[in-house]
């Protein structure tokens, strides 16, 4: 019934973490099934295979990949509040990986294989990763994302 569905959604959203709360404990929750919620900032319009859930300031996002009962994310979800159930994953970029990326970028730039705007964007990403690693005394830059299982639109 609709009342049962509403109760289920309410119980999901009551235990759902906000983006910043999830990121604060992410290193301890990798490979755990988690529930979090927030507004959809962006959906990938070509494939619909991922969306990005933001914190209240729109400065921090977590990527959600399709999986489980989620077949795609449609554009109509943008600006909707959703509660996502999924498995928290991490992608690690070691210092060595970043060094190699930077070297390859410089070589491509020297050969004229990439346009300036693309190179500037990648250089900025590399710089931000290095700054974060230095500030946090880490030997790798970690990006957390969620392999989706299901989601509910929060009323």
Where do the language-model regions lie?
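OB-fold and OB-like single-stranded nucleic-acid-recognition modules
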Residues: 1-155
């Amino acid at each position: 019934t609709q009342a049962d569905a509403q109760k289920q959604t309410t119980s999901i959203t009551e235990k759902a973490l906000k983006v910043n709360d999830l990121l604060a404990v992410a290193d301890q929750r990798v490979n755990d099934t988690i529930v979090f919620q927030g507004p959809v900032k962006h959906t990938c319009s070509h494939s619909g295979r991922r969306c990005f859930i933001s914190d209240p300031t729109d400065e921090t996002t977590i990527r959600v990949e399709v999986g489980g009962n989620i077949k795609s994310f449609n554009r109509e979800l943008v600006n909707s509040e959703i509660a996502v159930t999924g498995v928290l994953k991490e992608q690690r970029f070691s210092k060595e990986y970043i060094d190699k990326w930077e070297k390859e970028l410089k070589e491509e730039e020297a050969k004229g294989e990439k346009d300036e705007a693309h190179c500037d964007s990648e250089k900025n990403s590399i710089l931000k990763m290095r700054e974060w690693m230095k500030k946090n005394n880490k030997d790798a830059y970690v990006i957390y994302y969620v392999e989706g299982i299901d989601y509910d639109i929060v009323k």
